[in-house]
Curated annotation (Swiss-Prot):
Could be a nuclease involved in processing of the 5'-end of pre-16S rRNA. It comes from Rickettsia rickettsii (strain Sheila Smith). Its EC number is 3.1.-.-. This is Putative pre-16S rRNA nuclease. GO terms for molecular function: nuclease activity.
Length: 154
């Protein structure tokens, strides 16, 4: 189920279970995982497959393996806050994922996270090819970190 309010999302979480975050791009998906205490976000994986059924199968395996209690999906909106074509694609994906899992899903504004992730990796001296292979997972961890920081204030 897609939850629009962060407090409601937090209320539905199972204690001592991690969250995953997804940075859904047009060519690949970045995935990040929190610790059980919901205090740390870590890049986990990048999926280069964009077929929704395959992606959902991979996500179901991750959810089962790590005993995840909720999902955060980065919602791409433009700088003015307007909905874009990519926003609609991500919303459709979120709705498909919601049909496949019985976990709360929260959509988090993700403006500029992939660019910030790429810049962060660049500042560490990571080569362009490696940055492009990992920037979505790092962006997912930034999206997750934003939510974890907000949860601390609830």
């Amino acid at each position: 189920m897609i939850i629009k309010n962060l407090q409601e999302f937090y209320r539905l979480l199972i204690p001592n279970a991690p969250l995953i975050a997804i940075d859904y791009g047009s060519k690949k998906l970045g995935i990040a995982l929190s610790n059980q205490e919901l205090s740390i976000a870590m890049p986990l994986n990048t999926i280069t497959e964009i077929n929704t059924k395959i992606v959902i199968t991979v996500l179901l395996n991750i959810i089962e393996k790590y005993k995840v209690c909720g999902v955060i999906i980065g919602l791409p909106i433009d700088m003015s806050g307007a909905v874009t074509e990519q926003t609609n694609i991500v919303m459709k994906f979120a709705e498909e994922l919601a049909k496949s899992i019985n976990l709360p899903i929260y959509l988090q504004d993700e403006r500029l996270t992939t660019k910030a992730a790429n810049n962060l990796l660049k500042s560490f001296g990571v080569k362009r090819k490696d940055r492009n292979n990992n920037d979505d997972a790092v962006a997912a961890s930034m999206i997750l970190e934003t939510v974890l920081d907000s949860i601390k204030n609830i």
